């Protein structure tokens, strides 16, 4: 049970969708930036930067992002939790924050050339904490409530009907990217770009499952589960040694108690991951009096972590945690990205923007070799964007935009520590030009997530654990009778604030 908890949690956290296109406050104001000609183009439309006025341009941005990740899990054995008020449905909520997200964009535009620099969290970043674990954690421990009555039937006064557990998970992940490139204006209407991004990815995961307790004799007092099961196993072994004729009756019980004793031991996992990667980037831009059209392609960034872990012995001995053993190699590639954008200027001062993004998630390797999670996806993520910007006067401009993101999620891919759902995001903000050299931007971005519903006849592989303790036939019967069915409803919240300044020399 301990292994199932941390195995599910950390395997999930190691891989995920790395699709951060928010690298400038201009994105918060209007996410449809794929054909815009501004300093944010150093990331979103680098070929278009050639059409900025000559000089040195520098952008400094600070953002703050806050998320919640909510999973409403339904599983009948949850009702046996001492702190669950006899309810089989439970809300598991994690909080994630990145209070300071810096980014820097710079461009030197001279004649037909624009030499560019970008530093940002290209694959996202921040920290997440789950103070009460997740459904994948607790569902494994909740199975004790199904085992207790059988033990009571076999040994009067030795059973139980309630459990307690201390489950915790904390993770940090940052993917820093530095991009150098240059664009060349072929003529007054067309420009091209080539660049190279270097990525440094770092992650740390800490989790524990400990103090699993049961109420021996169905009473109000709780005792450590592992020690209790070990004591019963030792007692039964003594009886069996004295009376070998009882082997057919006692041997299965000895096996069950031994398995339960091992499964309920404390498990602690402490893993660090680091790696570098590189990706070429190419782009093109077409400009006319009333319309701009742009495209960009970022190649896949291969990230291969090699774990530096200090796990408990109980964790290192568990095959389900193989991906987090010291020295294990885990992939966490940043997928290739193709973007298209159009900007239309129907009247003076008004800019309308359309964009499309396609992430090649299915080709980006994620997880332990031989069990890559990306292979569970249907295709790649798609994003559709629309936005508008209007100049109120020579100093003030206002903007807003919307982004629709559709992920190729499948039931096999979705789990409660590495999930995201389809979403609609709204951004708005203002820009204020202090003078010809200084411009200030401020924006707010809010994401509204859909709910993804997942049902399972064998919730979090719960029957597999019963099978280890009571045999394959017992596990099969549980699935057939619906005793281990369950469901999850996944959703999230996300909000980002940001301010930035652009300097032109």
Give the ranges of each region predicted by the language model.
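N-terminal, post-signal peptide beta-strand-biased segments of exported outer-membrane/organellar beta-barrel
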Residues: 10-127, 419, 445
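Outer-membrane beta-barrel porins/channels
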Residues: 15-28, 32, 37, 101, ...
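Bacterial N-terminal signal peptides
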Residues: 2-9
């Amino acid at each position: 049970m301990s292994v199932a908890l941390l195995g599910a949690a950390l395997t999930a956290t190691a891989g995920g969708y790395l699709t951060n296109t928010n690298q400038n406050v201009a994105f918060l104001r209007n996410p449809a930036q794929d054909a815009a000609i501004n300093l944010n183009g150093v990331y979103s439309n680098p070929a278009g930067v050639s059409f900025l006025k000559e000089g040195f341009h520098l952008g400094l941005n600070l953002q703050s992002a806050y998320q919640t990740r909510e999973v409403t899990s339904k599983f009948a054995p949850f009702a046996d939790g001492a702190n669950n008020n006899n309810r089989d449905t439970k809300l598991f909520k994690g909080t994630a924050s990145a209070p300071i997200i810096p980014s820097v964009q710079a461009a030197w535009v001279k004649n037909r050339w624009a030499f560019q620099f970008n530093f940002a969290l290209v694959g996202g970043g921040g920290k997440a904490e789950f103070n009460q674990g997740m459904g994948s954690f607790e569902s494994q421990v909740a199975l004790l409530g199904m085992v207790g009555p059988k033990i009571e039937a076999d040994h009067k006064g030795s059973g139980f009907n309630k459990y307690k557990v201390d489950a915790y998970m904390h993770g940090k992940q940052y993917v820093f990217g530095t991009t150098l490139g240059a664009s060349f204006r072929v003529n007054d209407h067309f420009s091209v770009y080539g660049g190279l991004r270097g990525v440094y990815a770092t992650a740390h995961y800490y989790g524990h499952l400990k103090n699993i307790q049961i109420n021996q004799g169905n009473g109000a007092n709780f005792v450590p589960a592992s020690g209790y099961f070990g004591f019963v196993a030792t007692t039964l072994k003594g009886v069996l040694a004295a009376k070998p004729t009882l082997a057919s009756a006692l041997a299965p019980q000895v096996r069950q108690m031994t398995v339960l004793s091992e499964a309920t031991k404390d498990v602690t996992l402490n893993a660090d991951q680091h790696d570098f990667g590189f990706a070429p980037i190419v782009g093109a831009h077409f400009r006319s009096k009333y319309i701009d059209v742009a495209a960009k392609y970022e190649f896949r960034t291969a990230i291969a972590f090699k774990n530096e872990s200090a796990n408990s012995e109980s964790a290192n001995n568990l095959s389900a945690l193989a991906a987090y053993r010291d020295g294990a190699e885990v992939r966490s590639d940043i997928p290739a990205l193709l973007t298209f954008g159009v900007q239309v200027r129907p009247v003076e001062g008004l800019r309308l923007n359309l964009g499309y993004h396609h992430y090649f998630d299915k080709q980006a390797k994620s997880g332990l070799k031989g069990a890559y999670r990306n292979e569970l996806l249907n295709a790649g993520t798609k994003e559709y964007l629309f936005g508008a910007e209007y100049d109120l006067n020579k100093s003030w401009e206002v903007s807003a935009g919307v982004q629709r993101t559709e992920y190729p999620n499948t039931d096999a891919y979705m789990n409660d520590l590495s999930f995201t759902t389809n979403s609609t995001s709204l951004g708005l903000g203002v820009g204020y030009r202090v003078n010809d050299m200084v411009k200030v931007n401020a924006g707010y971005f809010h994401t509204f997530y859909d709910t993804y519903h997942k049902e399972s006849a064998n919730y979090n592989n719960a029957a597999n654990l019963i099978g280890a303790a009571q045999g394959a036939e017992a596990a099969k019967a549980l699935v057939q009778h619906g005793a281990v069915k369950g469901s999850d409803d996944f959703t999230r919240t996300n909000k980002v604030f940001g301010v930035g300044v652009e300097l032109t020399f």
